[in-house]
């Protein structure tokens, strides 16, 4: 029999080179008799690809997938990624360097321990398979791996990407002042010259628009940009909030 285990890979390929017969996963069963030569939970019949005589080597590391415990070299073992195709792009996760298709590679999203990939929002879906890793309502594809506030946490994992004290889930992707910077990354969302960190989410005039998005926070007819943060009458209330 030229294919003793019937996995579609000829014994001549699976036996390996030299006098020693290959047993990749060290389970005591030689590869040519082992339906899962690398013991990653994905059968050789799947990993070999369309031509068993020349099995696939997806990451071009010289180790064919059926013997490679990390076929796409993203740092996450095939045994963890499996054959699921999270982003339905036709490439199973164990071969996909961006399993969720959010534009952030699995090698980044996995975190420091590939055996226990990071799950930022603790929703049971690890970041490399989660389209909204921090659960703030803004997709990772939009937030990206940049770190707007320089706090060491990339936006896709940061609940307050601009560090203004107002959560991204509150600010959202609206661009109040039309400066091409969405509010969740804008330190002055309404462009009135008073930072969001100062204005906060209070709605001083009760008009339904929080101060950080309100050009006239106290509703006195004078814009916040004119009134500013000075306290003309010294009563402890800045002019932009003082009637």
What is each stretch, according to the model?
Residues 1-243:
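Extracellular calcium-associated, cysteine-rich motifs in secreted modular proteins
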